[in-house]
Amino acid sequence: MKIHIIYQLKCRLIKAFKRIKSIHILIILFFSFVCWEILGFSTNILADFLWFQELNYLPVLINKLQTETWLWITTFLISMGFFLVNLRLASFFKYSKKQVRITERSEEIMLIPPVTIPSSKLRIEPSLSLSWLLCCIFGLILLVGLILTHYIDVFTNYLYPDLTVANVSPQIPSEFNIESICKILTSILSNLWLLGLFLLLSFAIIINPILWLSVFAVVLSLVFSFILSSHWANILQLLHGTPFNKSEDLFHIDISFYVFQLPVLELLRFWLIGLFLYGFVACILIYLLSGKSLSQGNFYQFSQQQEKHLHGLGGGFILTIAFSYFIACFELLYSRRGVVYGAGYTDIKVQLPAYVFLGILALLIAFFLFWQAIFSVKSIQSYIEASLWFLRLGRKRKRKKKVIAKLFANSYSLRAILTWYLIIAVIAGWLIPKIVQMAIVQPNEIEREIPYIKRSITFTKEAYIDVDKLEVELFDPNNELTYDDLINNKLIIENIRLWDTRPILQTNRQLQQIRPYYEFINADIDRYTFLKKESERTKNNLTKKQQVIIAARELNYESVPQPAQTWVNEHLVYTHGYGFTLSPINQVEKNGLPEYFVKNIGPDPTLEKNSTLEVLNRIRDSIPIGKPRIYYGELTNTNIMTSTAQRNKELDYPSGEANSYNTYDGSGGIVIGQGWQRWIFAKYLKDWKMLLTNEFIPETKLLYRRNINARVRSIAPFLRYDHDPYLVVADPNFGHKNMNQKNPNYLYWIIDAYTTTNHYPYSDPENNEFNYIRNSVKVVIDAYNGSVKFYVADPKDPIIRTWKKAFSDMFNSIEEMPTSLYTHIRYPLDLFQVQSEVLSTYHMDDPRVFYNREDLWRVPIEIYGAQQQKVKPYYLITQLPTETSEEFILLLPYTPASRNNLIAWLAARSDGENYGKLLLYQFPKQRLIYGIEQIEALINQDPEISQQISLWNRQGSKAIKGNLLVIPINESLIYVEPIYLEAEQNSLPTLRRVIVSYKNRVVMKPTLDEALQEVFQIQ
């Protein structure tokens, strides 16, 4: 009985499923997919909402989302409306199968339009033959494929932004043009599967053109919406733009137009070209494929309604071309044709008039086509013929009557106009400028281009450097330096860098990682004010400034042993790094290893019982240490849950044979103890174990986006960020009672942020993605709580002023930065490298000297280890020739492009009121000042030095040359290079010798002081 009932139930289910058609299943699956995507989108929005709310930047997210939503909806409605209206018109005007009839007398096919036309006006004209029809159809289908490929390719590049790059904001995409067509065709020909996809596309369109062209229209509308909404930052800049109060020299328009408005116009061009071109091509395809044209083997002319429709679309496309030429006039200021970047002789004298002519001609053609689409051009034919007769001064030219008559025939005008316009555009817009450049400009280039070279020099320097902060001085190192001068400059000598970040990191990884899951990813040079040693202190002088190398000990979960990489360990136990090392840059222990001011983990019995790092007493009295936990850093890539059940506490730090544990009590994180929040983040993070674990309690918090680089880019993607965040130990709450006394945190990350654009006129981008840059923002991230603060460092920059208008609550004044943090801001390395590269060429103000590259500079080459490399900018504490006290600067020497002697050095200042100033010291050209390569040659030629290095290299060790530093002292120069010794079996470098060179003397000794005494012949 039971078996019979089960069998009947099974039969009924089978019958029920049979009633459901496959189309119903597809509809159900489609709507299920849509609902799932909507759910995912909603959870993403809610998760971001909670995350921005935690950081107190919710207004930033709301402003961004409002702009994105407005852009998305507007773009989609306009695009979809345009496509649907035109495809619907094409469907209405196309020839139907019932309108095909064969005449008995002529046995020709006559296509009758859907609108009733008197039989007297029906005419049969020669049709497209099958071969021409196939060429037209497959050519247009190929064009549809190229359009789809181009715009979808742009879309995919926008879909998943890389949060590790310097600037997350997308660049303005290139429009669909000949260059993009060639690139796509090359890709298709080199990939057989793309060729197969094109054939499949062709068959689909031929079988059901209206269906598939409508589907592609929906896809393109979605793509347009996504791409344009991704440029919300450009729209906000347009709405809140701030004048630069400086105009370019061609059109005399304020630079703000090029920076804030021109990108939006280019984005509009990108959209309109795709919109009108696809609509135009799709409608032509529908008309050509209608009325059984392929099966009949020919196609008769377009009907009057079809012609009017195509003329309207063609007029819109030509109007877009006119708009494109209007934009191209301004884009000449970014031309690369001439000897320098920006508009040159040919651009201004030939290309600009050509663009204006082609733009006006396109406007006239668009008007002509619109007239044909709305009325009939024959109604004004007599007036146009009279005008042409008047322009020919009454001469009768019968030969052209036929051409004119054809022009006013609807079936001929569109093809003739587009063909002739293309020919004129190639001749006027490409051929003539190329001939002028080769035949007129290049033979007399310097005379033709001088005024434009001046413009490029001026605008490039202004774009990369605040010229008000750049001073150029003559530096003549002819002072005879003595050992007494070194004693009088003791602070400079004590801060000559003997330890580079690379050997320090190697040593840290050998001696200070403590456990395999700890890692020192980076080390940074900074300066701190410490108490002097007791023997050096005086009543009025207790402290001194000292350069140090600081490195954070972060936790890298990927280094946890594979068997221990469980869900609980990843998210609940291995949550944070601990501590840091602090090393003076020029102090060495007896065994040649670097000395540490701060090192190790765990209580130090010789110091305080509650200490967790081994710290020298005078250092502990100089800087705060606290409990240096690092929950937010450069390696914190996992999402963690804190304040969970007590059975799985967070690993704090190793303590002898056991471990110390901790429970996070910081202000960071989002409470997920409630069920709905757990569901949201389980979906957002795609981690369903969050719903199944029993470890969560009502106080449990989720900490995610802990990587500081991704963190700041998620908040402000419109800024460009330095590649090197650096750790600072400071007490910003010094003197305040509201600080967390139980677990005080004193670790902060500082990241330099830049405002950039690639639309600054006449400014040469060289190899950069931008041609304007300012270090406008300093970002401070709390390594324990995760809070982020943005401080405006350059309030004069128009771009950051624009962003302050758009996000009024986001940015703080630099004066609001706590003093303990402000003393650690430094001139950013990335900016300095860009500026030094620009100045190597653009220091030449004379256009003739610039054209001939007579005074071109380069960055010198040094030997590091056994490899040659460009000298990297280096921080040092020194006294500038024009100043009275020592300061922290960033320095880079220059040599001439074809020689090895020093020609100049660039210094960037970092202290106090002088922060941000640049000093360019140029050496006299009539005297020889030894360069880096020349000093390296002197070192290699010294018999004692070369013999000792060769001996080390034969004894199972490897001698490594460190950075060769040029140190300015009292209007003179000394050169210092450390020599490290590293065993082949163990990468633990030790400092064994120091080479010092002054003038043509070179000595190598075990210590810096011995080398200085020897080179200055002190007994």
From Swiss-Prot:
Its main location: membrane. It holds the Pfam family UPF0182. It is a multi-pass membrane protein. GO terms for cellular component: extracellular region; plasma membrane. It is found in: Cell membrane. The chain crosses the membrane at residues 23-43, 67-87, 128-148, 192-212, 213-233, 270-290, 313-333, 355-375, 416-436. Keywords: Cell membrane, Membrane, Transmembrane, Transmembrane helix. It comes from the Bacteria. Belongs to the UPF0182 family. HAMAP family: UPF0182 (MF_01600). This is UPF0182 protein Tery_0938. It comes from Trichodesmium erythraeum (strain IMS101).
